[in-house]
Amino acid sequence: MSPAPHLVPRPHQIEASEAILAARRAGRPGFLLGDLTGLGKTLSAWLALSAMPEEEILVICPKGAIPQWRLTMAQAGLPAKSVTLMNFERTKTLMAPPAVSTKRSTRARNNELAKLGTPKRVWPLVVIDEAHRIRNPNSQQGLVCRQMAAAADFTLYMSATAGQAPHELSYLARLLVQGGDRRKGEGLGADLDGFRALMKRLGIGRAKGRWKNWSWEPNEDDRRTMSFLLYKGPNAIGLRRRPEEIAGWPEVQREITPTALDAESRRLYEATWREFRRELGLAGGSTRRAAGWAADLRFRQKGSLIRIAGTADFADDLIGNGQQVAISVAFLETSALLVEKLRGHGWRVDAINGTQSGERNEAVRLAFQRGELDAVVFTVTEAISLHRGEMPGGERERSLVVHDMRHSAIQLQQIEGRCHRDGQRAVIYYAYAENTVEEKIAATVIGRMADMDGMAGDDTAMLDAIAGVIEEAAEAR
């Protein structure tokens, strides 16, 4: 198959690449590219990387993003480089184990490898795409990625959702902390200590003891402070733009869409709701406790299955009006049944999910992008492009239906960017069962998504708001 047309960078992508290069010229150890999902961060990054003198580059990214990186590099028309593409799950292969080990279990050896191992080789340029994945400094992937970044001359961090709370940004310590902690190759402990000192100096949160015990109460003053440090201050370490700030870029259009329940589905839903209320009461009345959270998850999964027919009917209408439809779901069983239901209606449908190989998922994605599928049902939240006009045959209007509401602003923002991206508009429909607690949850989510700035605390605030809605409804009905 012949390659797609040559990629032409847009002005905002050139601006991003110039900001990255300016940080490099200023001697900074890295840069945070925080543009919202759909603004083409991959091409922005590659424009900058291709202009740097180093030939060898390590790109660490989600497995599903590897095809996009390959496509961007192939179609950008820029000088070739020696690029190693590595997904997060394979990063341990980058490390050599310590000379002596007494660990016996696989888990213990892997932890030791990530913490005490040394890089088998060093790349001068490192990219960490979807960098929020390494926000836990004690995770195996986080430890390895931070070591590779520490050994590099320059590291580019890419994430539209850098962290839910300020202390989750410790992976950016070398960029944020002045002085010795920014020196190439220093220990990771110095990074965390330096970041801890920064948080204490700024009076943000409680940074005492082990990282997992750090805490923070969302507030606007801290959000403004972090925004200043990350993106808006004169010495900001990164760049972040929203789609509506880009000239000619379509704004996100969100709609809440009620789906009807027939008599039997209504009976099942109400029985499921009663069972949830009973379990929640036994759990102390809060979804923020482990038992309450588990009860909430069971309720959402059962509700997801009950609503399949309504979502299929809604997708019927969209496809019948000449559109292609991407449907986001949270559960594999829902995915399989939705595909079966829509195929039964005569549509060409397939799925993208974590049970399939990367090659299979990419084949489904390409079929959708070429217009060979009417709908695709997907469980992933990041690293795939399902927007209109990427390939010949994919010119139909697109709609995104969120069948399963996530209780995370970060996940929802990532999901929204699967279709509404690269300057292509896609209406985003949040589906819910009418006359149920889901109606108020959907309204709460839409309101908060419209106002969110993607900075620290958005995800926590949304989770608390949704929990409040559910708990209030459980007590009242």
Could you say what each language-model-derived stretch is?
Residues 42-75, 163-168, 330-333:
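Conserved Walker A/P-loop ATP-binding site and its immediately adjacent core
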Residues 242-348:
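Conserved helicase/translocase motor-coupling segment
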Residues 125, 142-245, 425:
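Conserved P-loop NTPase motor "coupling/switch" region that bridges the ATPase
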Residues 27-47:
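Walker A/P-loop
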Residues 381-414, 418, 422:
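Conserved RecA-like helicase motor core of SF1/SF2 enzymes
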Residues 324-328, 337, 343-380:
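Conserved helicase ATPase core of P-loop NTP-dependent helicases/translocases
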Residues 1-32:
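Conserved pre-motif I regulatory segment
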Residues 407-477:
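A conserved SF2-helicase RecA2
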